[in-house]
Amino acid sequence: MKGKEADTIKSLKQFFTAERPDAYTLEDLRNILRILRSDEGCPWDRKQTFETMVPCVLEEAGEVTEAVRNQDTENLCEELGDLLFQVVFYCQMAEEQGLFAFEDAVDGISRKMVRRHPKIFGGDLPETDGNEGDLWERIKRAEKAKNHKTT
């Protein structure tokens, strides 16, 4: 770890304590992950890869599904947090490899939601008969076809 990065990690660590009275934020979670993946962090977290984290993502997604099916809203909140952690973890690994940043993932999904909801976000589409799911699928197929042509 470079000197400046090590100093940043040390300075960040002081903000994270079990007794912290303030609520944590998404940026806090991202910083916690940076610390966990740093040289001063957790050996298990440091050695994880995209591939080794797949079972964790699947497990957490399954636990979200189970909480929904059981109408267990208290557990749902916790399980959604666990699933969010997986997303942030993947983005942190991607950023470390110079692939993309968390902000890129947020930008990508935001743009996709706007594109796939043209009736809501000012697209030039006629009113539909309530089959917005069909519209979503048509737009999705068109996007995939366009992406396959450009790759």
Question: Can you name each region flagged by the protein language model?
Answer:
Residues 1-79, 85-151:
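Flexible "arm" and connector segments at domain edges
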